[in-house]
Curated annotation (Swiss-Prot):
InterPro entries: Chorismate_synth, Chorismate_synth_AroC_sf, Chorismate_synthase_CS. Gene3D superfamilies: Chorismate synthase AroC. Its cofactor is FMNH2. This is Chorismate synthase. GO terms for molecular function: chorismate synthase activity; FMN binding. The lineage of its organism: Bacteria, Pseudomonadati, Pseudomonadota, Betaproteobacteria, Burkholderiales. Homotetramer. Belongs to the chorismate synthase family. It comes from Paraburkholderia xenovorans (strain LB400).
Length: 366
């Protein structure tokens, strides 16, 4: 299994399985001198950890991070940063009934066909449990970007199943377990999830992420375009089936006179491009939307096959998120942060001394 590393200069390699003794990551390429401690990382992990409400998996993991290397006297040294998170609440017996069968919609079948061996306990390496190290690494990236450029990366749930969530205020996002920017809709979402759980089914979600204060010039055309790497990273999140940058698929119905964001001396007029033109950041907000499929581990009986290719009926009885999208907001934020820090370092390496006479215009015209 060779696809475990993200990035070019700022790289993150994750390791571990859902029911193994621990999970974690190694960050290489982090600039030295960044003030960093475990509390900085724990703040982000606590936003993602399981068992925080009745609407997510009831697996009780504290997700306490340990910094094993790369930090001395409270500062990064430039050496690899190893982060460890111990698993403490595995319940592998719940998965005995799927040891020889494949859950519809899950990676069980493809992992078995590719590797000829499969850790069926909690999904093994394919589990969303492995997003915790990504969030830990993202916390480091967020801190560096904030201190270097003033970049802020924020996300929210924009839709739960067929329920669209009107945006009201960023302040609401941290006040509810759904990460929605609209407190008034929370009771409706809770009732929806309660009914879904009783039915033994699951549902998908849409998450929006916005990065503000991103400097102009990040991105490496042609094949390492900023938006291409963002899409690549977002598709690396478990259960993500679609990514939009800016207007995304709505661009199909827009005319060029509408979609093209006009430039004035006072700033850009509109941001249909989502902060990226020609694969390079414009200095505007980078806007990303991801679609997350319904969780495949459900109590509803489903048709499948066993390892011998014989018909089987699969029911899953473990502790699972009925909507993995509920905890996906900090994960998507972290992925965006990891791409941005990597491209910031790449830009500095090649184009740090480039200057032009044209002034940088504002992200939006007044």
């Amino acid at each position: 299994m060779s696809g475990n590393t993200l990035g070019t200069l700022f790289t993150v390699t994750t390791f571990g399985e859902s029911h193994g003794p621990a999970i974690g990551c190694v960050i290489d390429g982090c600039p030295p001198g960044l003030a960093l401690n475990e509390a900085d990382i724990q703040l982000e992990l606590d936003r993602r950890k399981p068992g925080t409400s009745r609407h997510v998996t009831q697996r009780q993991e504290e997700d306490k991070v340990e910094i094993l290397s790369g930090v001395f006297e409270g500062q990064t040294t430039g050496a690899p940063i190893a982060l460890l998170i111990r698993n403490t609440d595995q319940r592998s017996k719940d998965y005995g009934n799927i040891a020889d069968t494949f859950r519809p919609g899950h990676a069980d079948y493809t992992y078995w066909q590719k590797y000829g061996i499969r850790d069926y306990r909690g999904g093994g390496r394919s589990s969303a449990r492995l997003t915790a190290p990504t969030v830990a690494a993202g916390a480091v990236a967020k801190k560096w970007l904030r201190e270097k450029f003033g970049t802020e990366i924020r996300g929210y749930m924009a839709a739960l199943g067929e329920i669209d969530v009107p945006f009201v205020d960023w302040a609401h996002v941290r006040e509810n377990p759904f990460f929605v920017p609209n407190q008034q809709i929370v009771p409706q979402l809770e009732a929806y999830m309660d009914a879904l759980r009783k039915e033994g089914d699951s549902i998908g979600a849409r998450i929006n992420v916005v990065a503000s204060g991103v400097p102009v010039g990040l991105g490496e055309p042609l094949f390492d375009r900023l938006d291409a790497d963002i899409a690549h990273a977002m598709m690396g999140i478990n259960a993500v089936k679609g990514v939009e940058i800016g207007a995304g698929f709505a661009s199909v119905a827009q005319r060029g006179s509408v979609h093209g964001d006009e430039l004035t001396p006072e700033g850009f007029v509109g941001n249909h491009a989502g902060g990226v033109l020609g694969g390079i950041s414009t200095g505007q907000d980078i806007t990303v939307s991801i679609a997350i499929k319904p969780t495949s581990s459900i109590r509803t009986p489903r048709r499948s096959i066993d390892k011998a290719g014989q018909p089987a009926v699969v029911e899953t009885f473990g502790r699972h998120d009925p909507c993995v999208g509920i905890r996906a907001t900090p994960i998507a934020e972290s992925m965006l942060a990891l791409v941005l820090i990597d491209h910031a370092l790449r830009h500095r390496a090649q184009c740090g001394d480039v200057s032009v006479s044209t002034p940088k215009i504002a992200a939006s015209a007044p």
